[in-house]
């Protein structure tokens, strides 16, 4: 019988946690937290429950409420939802960039401020809400002043438009709001937008036969992956930016291009940092990820292979095609032929060179 202890041994202690938040959401006893959400922020001297995480810990922690370890009750939900365990279901990564039935160079026609890289994801979600194809979307919300990221549950088109422009350069446990969506708000047509590790966690949920995960897998309707080579620790990156006197509210755009992290400010200044020299700012869990595009998604979107202001859109199955086609037909997205797929393949192969997790 699996418990969080198996997850801790195989993932947390080995520093391969992706930080996706899946384990937090599916835990029925709310036993698992990331340090920012810990219900107790001090060491407990009255019992053995010291649940304050280490200062630089990137993995979740246990509040010692696990029903497997306390009462020998069958669970294992957290283990079965994790994309980094020994028993994870691995989508075939060898053929990059995965199954693609159609690819497009596209951009949103929505008149919305701050839209990033063509705004196609925002447009797909906005149309899906308008047509009642979804009743919720799990996305990232970014404070426009501090750039502090958080998981956000959008329940309307207006909510989605508020998140436009949020940068997924920061790691945030996006799936942590899945429990609220499914168990509290009883949503059952949910879209999930995230980096490949997040989408791979959803794939784990879809593949498991654990009854406790069943409500979550049934509620997810659409998976949209964003191209990602790696994400950065928010606190560490802010310190790095302060070294070059860049405040978070001055940042207009952050992107990775040609081996560099490029930061553009509202004042017209551009700073670039070599990715090879940014290792200490990258989440440790990112270093074992080999998926650049989110192969297990329905739709993958990024800005590689298209010019400024456009998105590269990879349609992976008929399900994703249905959502995208309706978005185009309804005038939310403009398509201008195919994207250049070679740069996507090149970066996918480069990321595949990383060493896989070994047990």
Give residue ranges: language-model regions.
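Non-catalytic accessory regions outside enzyme or core folds
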Residues: 2, 9-12, 18, 22, ...
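Short loop/turn hinge sites at secondary-structure boundaries
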Residues: 15, 70, 184-185
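Alpha-helical architecture
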Residues: 19, 46, 195-196
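Iron-sulfur-associated redox domains of electron-transfer enzymes in respiratory
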Residues: 83-359
């Amino acid at each position: 019988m699996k418990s969080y202890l198996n997850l801790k041994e195989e993932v947390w202690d080995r520093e391969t946690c992706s930080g996706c938040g899946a384990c937090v959401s599916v835990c029925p006893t709310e036993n698992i937290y990331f340090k920012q959400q810990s219900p107790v922020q001090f060491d407990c001297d009255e019992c053995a429950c010291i649940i304050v995480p280490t200062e630089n810990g990137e993995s979740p922690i246990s509040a010692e409420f696990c029903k497997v370890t306390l009462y020998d009750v069958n669970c294992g939900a957290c283990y079965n939802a994790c994309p980094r365990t020994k028993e994870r279901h691995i989508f075939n990564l060898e053929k990059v960039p995965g199954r693609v039935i159609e690819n497009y160079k596209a951009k949103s026609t929505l008149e919305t401020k701050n839209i990033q890289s063509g705004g196609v994801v925002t447009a797909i979600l906005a149309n899906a809400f308008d047509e009642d194809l979804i009743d919720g979307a799990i996305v990232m919300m970014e404070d426009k002043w501090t750039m502090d990221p958080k998981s956000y549950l959008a329940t309307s088109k207006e909510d989605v438009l508020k998140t436009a422009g949020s940068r997924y350069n920061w790691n945030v446990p996006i799936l942590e709001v899945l429990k609220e969506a499914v168990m509290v708000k009883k949503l059952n047509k949910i879209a999930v937008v995230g980096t490949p590790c997040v989408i791979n966690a959803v794939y784990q949920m879809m593949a498991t036969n654990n009854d406790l995960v069943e409500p979550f897998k049934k509620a997810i309707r659409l998976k949209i992956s964003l191209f990602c080579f790696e994400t950065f620790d928010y606190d560490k990156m802010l310190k790095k930016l302060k070294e070059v006197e860049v405040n978070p509210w001055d940042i207009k755009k952050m992107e990775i291009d040609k081996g560099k992290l490029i930061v553009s400010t509202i004042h017209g200044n551009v700073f670039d940092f070599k990715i090879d020299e940014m290792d200490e700012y990258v989440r440790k869990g990112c270093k074992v990820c080999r998926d650049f595009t989110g192969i297990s998604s329905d739709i993958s979107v990024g800005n590689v292979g298209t010019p400024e202001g456009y998105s590269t859109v990879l349609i992976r199955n008929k399900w994703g095609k249905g959502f995208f086609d309706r978005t185009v037909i309804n005038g939310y997205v403009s398509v201008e032929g195919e994207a250049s797929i070679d740069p996507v393949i090149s970066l996918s192969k480069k990321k595949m060179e990383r060493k896989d997790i070994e047990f």
